[in-house]
Structures are given as structure tokens and as C-alpha cells.
Amino acid sequence: MENPHEKVQVGILARIVGNVERLNQSVATLNQELERINTRNRNLELMGQMCEHYGRATAFNLKTTGNRQGPV
């Protein structure tokens, strides 16, 4: 005996599989973009740390040598 709902179920399953494949592709693309953003953020964080350390070293050297002046 043939299931009368089989064709409908097969169609629904095919749509689900197609949607899941598209979703997986979208998630993979999102992950790639997030990785690029994270790389850029790491680079910006490193630059910020370098600037902060440079500022501290400059302030220390100016204070140590006695060449530090007040703000203009």
C-alpha cells in the first residue's frame, strides 16, 4: 500500500535540505567575514598597545632627562 502523503513529505524534505545547505553556506561566509574582522581588530589592538607603550616611554624619558614641559 502506497503512502498518500509520501510525495508531499519528499517535497518538504527536499525543501528542508535545500534550505539547510543554503544556511550552511551563509554561516560559512559569515565565519570567514568574522575571521577577517577579528584579524583587523587584533591588528588595531596591537597598534593601540604600541602607541600606548610609546607614549609611556616618551613620558618616562622626558621626565628622566628633565625635558618635560607642561601642555601648551
From Swiss-Prot:
PANTHER family: DASH COMPLEX SUBUNIT DAD4. This is DASH complex subunit DAD4. It is found in: Nucleus; Cytoplasm, Cytoskeleton, Spindle; Chromosome, Centromere, Kinetochore. It comes from the Eukaryota. Residues 13-50 form a coiled coil. It comes from Eremothecium gossypii (strain ATCC 10895 / CBS 109.51 / FGSC 9923 / NRRL Y-1056). Component of the DASH complex consisting of ASK1, DAD1, DAD2, DAD3, DAD4, DAM1, DUO1, HSK3, SPC19 and SPC34, with a stoichiometry of one copy of each subunit per complex. Multiple DASH complexes oligomerize to form a ring that encircles spindle microtubules and organizes the rod-like NDC80 complexes of the outer kinetochore. DASH complex oligomerization strengthens microtubule attachments. On cytoplasmic microtubules, DASH complexes appear to form patches instead of rings. InterPro entries: DASH_Dad4. Belongs to the DASH complex DAD4 family. GO terms for biological process: attachment of spindle microtubules to kinetochore; cell division; mitotic sister chromatid biorientation; protein transport along microtubule to mitotic spindle pole body. Component of the DASH complex that connects microtubules with kinetochores and couples microtubule depolymerisation to chromosome movement; it is involved in retrieving kinetochores to the spindle poles before their re-orientation on the spindle in early mitosis and allows microtubule depolymerization to pull chromosomes apart and resist detachment during anaphase. One of its GO terms (cellular component) is microtubule. Keywords: Cell cycle, Cell division, Centromere, Chromosome, Chromosome partition, Coiled coil, Cytoplasm, Cytoskeleton, Kinetochore, Microtubule, Mitosis, Nucleus. The gene is DAD4. Pfam families: DASH_Dad4.
